[in-house]
């Protein structure tokens, strides 16, 4: 479920006074911290996943990991399949916000700012409102920020980080 060892799971239960849900959340956060540390490591192996839906929609997704051992692992291939299904269903335009061209981000920020000012919102709150509008806009269009199709309570990025925690390798 979390990919942590029995000792770590037991420690999490002790730390949360036996509350299973809190222990599970603590282990997930610990796994995401480990995943972020692994983010620095180079991913040289991986697979290209594909999905075709009714001969109308086709998706090719490249997902990389550090070793060919993990690339052949069933959990990794399941992760790749899930990402393919998500891309087919959600049609993201970018992988992450960092991939959006600066000109497009600036143009959207200006458009949203003009809209907020035209609506008569207070100037001191305008920047905060625009920031929220940009975040929502990109959450709909950037793969890693989209709600994961199989579990809308988490983003695709969180799903991938769970995979990193379980597999013990960086995934990009």
Provide a role label for each language-model segment.
Residues 1-172:
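N-terminal assembly/interaction segments in proteins that build large macromolecular machines
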């Amino acid at each position: 479920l979390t990919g942590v060892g029995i000792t770590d799971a037991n420690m999490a239960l002790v730390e949360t006074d036996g509350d299973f849900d809190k222990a599970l959340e603590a282990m997930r956060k610990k796994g995401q911290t480990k995943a972020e540390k692994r983010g620095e490591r180079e991913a040289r192996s991986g697979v290209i996943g594909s999905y075709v839906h009714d001969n109308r929609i086709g998706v090719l997704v490249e997902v990389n990991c550090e070793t060919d051992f993990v690339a052949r692992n069933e959990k990794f291939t399941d992760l790749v399949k899930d990402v393919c299904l998500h891309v087919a269903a959600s049609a993201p335009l970018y992988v992450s916000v960092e991939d959006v061209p600066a000109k497009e981000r600036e143009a959207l920020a200006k458009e949203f700012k003009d809209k907020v000012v035209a609506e008569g919102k207070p100037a001191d709150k305008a920047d905060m409102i625009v920031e929220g509008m940009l975040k929502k806009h990109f959450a709909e269009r950037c793969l890693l920020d989209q709600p994961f199709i199989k579990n809308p309570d988490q983003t695709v990025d969180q799903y991938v980080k769970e995979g990193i925690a379980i597999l013990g390798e960086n995934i990009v």
